[in-house]
Amino acid sequence: MALSCSTVRPRRRGSALRSKMELLSRAEQEMSLAALKQHDPYITSIADLTGQVALYTFCPKANQWEKTDIEGTLFVYRRSASPYHGFTIVNRLNMHNLVEPVNKDLEFQLHEPFLLYRNASLSIYSIWFYDKNDCHRIAKLMADVVEEETRRSQQAARDKQSPSQANGCSDQRPIDILEMLSRAKDEYERNQMGGSNISSPGLQPSTQLSNLGSTETLEETPSGSQDKSAPSGHKHLTVEELFGTSLPKEQPTAMGLESEDTDKLLGDASQKEPSSFLPFPFEQSGGAPQSENLGIHSAAHHTVQPEVSTPVLITPASIAQSGDKHPPSYTLPLSPVLSPTLPAEAPTTQVPHLPRNSTMIQAVKTTPRQKSPLLNQPVPELSHSSLVASQSPFRAPVSLANPAGTALPSVDLLQKLRLTPQHDQIQAQPLGKGTMAPSFSSAAGQLATPESFIEPSSKTAAARAAVSASLSNMVLAPTLQSMQQNQDPEVFSQPKVLPSAIPIAGSPLVPATTTAVSSVLLSPSVFQQTVPRAADLERKASSPSPLTVGTAESQRKPSIILSKSQLQDTLIHLIKNDSSFLSTLHAVYLQVLTKNKDNHNL
């Protein structure tokens, strides 16, 4: 009995020592855990530790190992956030510790007493262990942790590709705004394609082709309804893919891709990783620019595309075919700039090689098939004076494009617009340029060109003299008559000049010597200047003034306000060449002097 009692007492002492050591080790672990949490608050527990390790690094240039200044205790810990595992070496030599997260990209190799590993940045390190048992234990733990992280990443990838619940919603997964926008975009495109299938049957092949992506997605996902798994193929949209293209599901038809090629592209895209998966893989493989989404297709692709109800721009090939046809006959002649029958004047020649996105050249090519804006309306029925104007060398449209379809100018305006050399009616022109209407054929109307405004220098003096002589009865005769009636010395003061009443850019009805087109295009300034003049003529005709002298022809003409230089030239010419004018002027001068003398005497 004594022997048995002596053998029991040491056992009790050993168990008490082990429990005491466990309490001490637990307290040390708690202290170590608190110290680690100061550096990383997401650490939850310590998985394993070893007392003495040293870190070596491999130098590829020297092809040898180099010892670092990191040496101390190794801790393997667990974290509550990603990455969920890691290890650190608490350095005893300095304040720089080694912290390495453990993920699926970490590779370990055991070479006793060293544990080699390579991280994601392709740096190679070696951990030397003082105890070989610790080296084997830590190596086995690291292998288990890497395997666990690999399974975790694969599960996260599967959860990202397909919903984790039956109703298509996952509470653990965060809400993705791009995924919500892509689902709304897919639903909108399905509604648009459904409406277009009813309106135009030509879009049915492209609709079937665009639905291949959703069909292959259904084959890879688990069993479920079509509505649950259809949006899963478009979860990895980017902002550029979502807002950068317009109607991308109609791309296969515009680019001329076959259905087999599209199936192959979609099959390759479905086997890739989720990060490289593209919802629209055929956009990059076609090699066509994004400008084809706007309807600017090439001529070769234009023949492959089926009939679509949406409007597209006319290609150069279609314009070349339509240009061979005869131009339609119109009641009014076209402008020479827009007329297809004048190849020398029309700058719309066919260019053999055009850029694909040159919309401006294509727009210019379509202009020969349009009417001139000024000749768009039919000529209204006018009175007898308009019939006479149609026989004159200047035929100008007098009607504007108004909703009522009536002619705005009156008959007097029509008479003012036409120019008849038989009655010697001269319109108001700037005397500084001295431009006169040259002789022209009376067979057809002429079109005013820039060359008609250039007058030879030899005709300038004669034209100026003729105009000043003809204007003397119109302007100076009423002035002299008013001086004789009023006997006012202020008559000789300089008259007010209104530069806006005299056209500076030349008369709008100057003819040219061309016989290509039998119509005259008028600028908008003609209607702005002639309408108030016609109103002044009607007002003057209704109220005759006793101050007007001369013939009946001069009474019908409006008074023209001359500038200082024009008045000076006219007066000098009349004083030198007209003796009656000089006599009348001298008589008025004597009367004014007599009146001033009488007023001074009174």
From Swiss-Prot:
It is an enzyme of class 3 (hydrolase). The modification Phosphothreonine is found at T367, T420, T548, T551. Disruption phenotype: Embryonic lethality around embryonic day 10.5 concomitant with massive growth retardation and cardiac developmental defects seen. It holds the Pfam family DCP1. One of its GO terms (biological process) is deadenylation-dependent decapping of nuclear-transcribed mRNA. Keywords: Cytoplasm, Hydrolase, Methylation, Nonsense-mediated mRNA decay, Nucleus, Phosphoprotein. One of its GO terms (cellular component) is P-body. This is mRNA-decapping enzyme 1A. It comes from Mus musculus. The lineage of its organism: Eukaryota, Metazoa, Chordata, Craniata, Vertebrata.
